[in-house]
């Protein structure tokens, strides 16, 4: 039977499905409950993508259960991660792309997460500027945001922006998709939570928060600037009274929308920018974390003089996370590789750290690269017998000599302050 796109009930083209698969293939990822991998689909796209397009255009597409795996968090706890099937990810990408094209132009300029031409660095820079203008910050932490978005309110939010029936149909089906737990049992959603691990979850979260928070605060408190990256939100206030009142209003707004703030992590912070000027009273918090950076009072060079500012730099939490990653890699045991090979293997990872955490106060990354250099010193001692029984200083001296002769070998060695010392 020959299918004609013009006669399909849902306006989805084969090109949309093919383009969506290209994006999914580029992002890689493992198989879902059906065991079908990206490589399997790539080897015979017509066998898999054509039936998917056929089902999506006829309205007969239903997602398979999402495979759940447990990922360790930095605090020792486990975080559930959902893995939809490859074909379900393709279907979600089709709708996510179309939905994003329709709604993104309506979003707040203060929303930075998972949007075209927006980035975390833009959010951090705007936050830095606003911290210089306003003395107080509300650091909001939503308890289990992605797991607690109410389905009814979410579907109403999507319907506010689009009346396309195929989008509303499939968003509803994805929210109702079952989850296969690690022990093999099937769990059905209880009317809340975005599609686990789904590529459509970010745009759905942005639609939901645009109505729940962005539009609400812009209308209610137009003078209070803010930055939002998905569920990470910073609100700026002129004084403590304004911050306290606004925080209570936000709590009530979230309660109305079936969200809850984390009491332990939500806090009001004083942005101290003057070394001589003390807070008007005893302040509990004078720093906060946002998108992997810590904002706090720091001495800065301004106009040829050292003055206090309130600026971002890589957070201790980020340093600790990367340090754990370095220890797990066991670089000091890679004695079967020459140092140049180790540098090549680590190049993209180190470059990624520098590109993200080195945008603001790059010098603060020194403590991170000190750990990496210590791993390399240990590698020298393990690699060469002549250093095993000697004091570690001699291995360090050897590594310093290599760094001096080949400063471009490791990405971080290109910066003098990050070399072995």
Indicate residue ranges for each PLM-predicted region.
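Amphipathic alpha-helical blocks
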Residues: 30, 40-65
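Core structural elements
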Residues: 65-66, 175, 179-180, 337-355
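Non-catalytic, peripheral interaction segments enriched in hydrophobic/basic residues
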Residues: 342-387
């Amino acid at each position: 039977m020959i299918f004609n796109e013009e006669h399909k009930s849902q306006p989805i083209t084969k090109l949309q499905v093919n383009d969506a698969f290209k994006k999914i293939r580029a992002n890689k990822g493992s198989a879902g409950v059906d065991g079908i991998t990206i490589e399997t689909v790539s080897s015979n796209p017509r066998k898999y993508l054509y039936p998917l397009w056929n089902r999506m255009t006829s309205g007969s597409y239903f997602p398979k259960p999402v495979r759940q795996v447990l990922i360790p968090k930095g605090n020792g706890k486990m975080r559930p991660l959902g893995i939809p099937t490859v074909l379900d990810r393709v279907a979600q990408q089709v709708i996510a792309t179309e939905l994003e094209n329709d709604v993104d132009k309506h979003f707040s300029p203060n929303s930075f997460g998972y949007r075209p031409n927006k980035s975390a660095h833009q959010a951090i820079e705007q936050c830095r500027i606003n911290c210089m203008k306003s003395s107080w910050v509300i650091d909001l932490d939503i308890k289990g945001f992605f797991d607690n978005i109410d389905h009814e309110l979410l579907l109403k939010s999507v319907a506010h922006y689009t009346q396309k029936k195929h989008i509303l149909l499939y968003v509803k089906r994805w929210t109702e998709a079952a989850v296969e737990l690690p022990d093999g049992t099937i769990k059905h959603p209880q009317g809340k939570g975005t599609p686990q691990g789904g590529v459509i979850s970010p745009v759905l979260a942005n639609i939901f928060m645009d109505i729940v928070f962005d539009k609400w605060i812009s209308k209610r408190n137009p003078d209070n600037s803010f930055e939002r990256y998905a569920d990470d939100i910073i609100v700026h206030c002129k004084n403590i009274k304004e911050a306290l009142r606004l925080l209570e209003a936000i709590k009530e707004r979230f309660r109305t929308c079936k969200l809850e703030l984390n009491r332990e992590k939500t806090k009001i912070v004083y942005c101290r920018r003057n070394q001589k000027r003390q807070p008007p009273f005893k302040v509990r918090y004078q720093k906060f974390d946002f998108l992997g950076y810590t904002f706090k009072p720091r001495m800065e060079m301004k106009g040829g003089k050292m003055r206090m500012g309130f600026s971002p730099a890589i957070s201790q939490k980020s340093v600790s996370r990367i340090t754990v990653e370095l220890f797990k890699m066991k670089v000091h045991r890679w004695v079967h590789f020459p140092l140049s090979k180790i540098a090549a293997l680590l190049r993209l990872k180190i470059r990624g750290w520098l590109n993200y955490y080195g945008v603001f106060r790059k010098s603060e990354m020194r403590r991170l690269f000190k750990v990496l250099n210590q791993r390399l010193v240990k590698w020298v001692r393990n690699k060469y017998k002549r250093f095993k029984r000697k004091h570690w200083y001699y291995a360090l001296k050897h590594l310093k000599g290599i760094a001096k002769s080949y400063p471009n070998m490791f990405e971080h060695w290109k910066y003098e302050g990050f070399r072995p010392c």
